């Protein structure tokens, strides 16, 4: 078929990096082996760096190295060797095959046990509280486990204030309301 198929495991444990270059496709599990093969890759990719420095994560395909991308968890790409281009990209999410009903008490027990295990040690634990469901649950359970939850939120300087959307800090506002209602150290 004259194709190369690259896939990454659904959990995203093992990395797969790739780059389209003039000669074809370069790929590997480590970026350092690709740097000499990908022109300009020793320069920083500003989008990836910006994403990481503002949010603490990089959910993009872009890596810090210009021109080198990563496959996302569960992603597969098909590269056409003759035409030197990616012809297909798909992402598969594994769904648990279970007919088990949601048990709120069991969920709470598992969540609390996970928080308890993660908070063992002498270091102080803090939660980045966005005001959303996930961080709210973690902060709430952390308070139940330790007696107090240290939370923090960031407020952003908007580049543009939309007349209807406001200043884009509604998440920070929600987090503050939640922190006050639960007496978090915010």
Predicted regions and their residues:
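Cysteine-centered catalytic environments shared across enzyme families
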Residues: 1-186
């Amino acid at each position: 078929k004259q194709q190369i198929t690259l896939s990454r495991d659904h959990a995203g444990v093992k990395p797969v990096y790739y780059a389209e270059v003039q000669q074809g496709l370069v790929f590997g599990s480590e970026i350092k082996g690709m740097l000499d093969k990908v022109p300009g890759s020793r320069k920083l990719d500003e989008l990836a760096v910006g994403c990481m420095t503002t949010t603490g994560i990089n959910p993009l395909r872009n890596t810090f190295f210009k021109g080198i991308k990563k496959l996302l968890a569960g992603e597969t790409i098909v590269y056409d060797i003759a035409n030197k281009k990616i012809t297909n990209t798909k992402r598969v999410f594994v769904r648990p095959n279970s007919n088990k009903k949601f048990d709120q008490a069991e969920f709470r027990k598992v969540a609390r046990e996970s928080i308890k295990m993660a908070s063992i040690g002498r270091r102080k634990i803090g939660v980045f509280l966005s005001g959303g469901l996930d961080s709210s649950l973690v902060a709430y359970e952390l308070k139940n486990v330790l007696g107090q939850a240290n939370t923090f939120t960031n407020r952003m300087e908007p580049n543009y204030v939309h007349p209807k959307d406001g200043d884009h800090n509604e998440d920070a506002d929600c987090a503050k309301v939640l922190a006050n209602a639960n007496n978090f150290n915010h």
